[in-house]
């Protein structure tokens, strides 16, 4: 079975979150269209994401060797094991769906902490001194979707100026070697339930075309 990794970044329950509501509809529809996939879910507000400490690394984005690992205390070793587990989980997936709100022109901090964990030398990227880093996740077909909710309606100009989250996620995915990337914006959720529902319904209409864009 192929694997879809569904990553959510919102403390709200699904029924109150526009990004998670659209995210659920998206993954359900994807699984309907692609029965050879199974889903694995990762809630970054419930999952422990290690804070990266210098003791965990022997060089940039490269975890410590065995000798250095054995000198760490038990808690530090557990943190290193968690980083490896998160990175392996990401690497094993075929399709990635990330659902997050726009916060401060970007996204909630847990997503950045997670990305810092999984961009790892020898696993998702190849980093050699004096050479340009290369992504390692071009080893098989992969695709990624970033589902983002925002209160404001994003015209082209406003999106370029304010929407840093989508551009960053696309860049980091391609940096790791994942070339197929699509965005699914749930913008204009506004301040009323009616506005939010309209934005969600509009996003629902785009789900099939986004799925076709990544797989």
From Swiss-Prot:
NAD in keyword set: yes
UniProt enzyme class: oxidoreductase
Cofactor(s) the record lists: FMN
Gene behind this protein: azoR
Binding residues annotated for FMN, in chain numbering: 17-19
Family, similarity comment: Belongs to the azoreductase type 1 family.
Name recorded for this polypeptide: FMN-dependent NADH:quinone oxidoreductase
Role this protein plays: Quinone reductase that provides resistance to thiol-specific stress caused by electrophilic quinones. Also exhibits azoreductase activity. Catalyzes the reductive cleavage of the azo bond in aromatic azo compounds to the corresponding amines.
Catalytic function, reaction form: 2 a quinone + NADH + H(+) = 2 a 1,4-benzosemiquinone + NAD(+); N,N-dimethyl-1,4-phenylenediamine + anthranilate + 2 NAD(+) = 2-(4-dimethylaminophenyl)diazenylbenzoate + 2 NADH + 2 H(+)
Lineage: Bacteria, Bacillati, Bacillota, Clostridia, Eubacteriales
Quaternary data: Homodimer.
Annotated cofactor note: Binds 1 FMN per subunit.
Gene3D superfamilies: 3.40.50.360
Record EC number: 1.6.5.-, 1.7.1.17
InterPro entries: Flavodoxin_fold (IPR003680), Flavoprotein-like_sf (IPR029039), FMN-dep_NADH:Q_OxRdtase_AzoR1 (IPR050104), NADH:quinone_OxRdtase_FMN_depd (IPR023048)
A molecular function (GO) term: electron transfer activity
Entry annotated with the keyword Cytoplasm: no
Keywords: Flavoprotein, FMN, NAD, Oxidoreductase
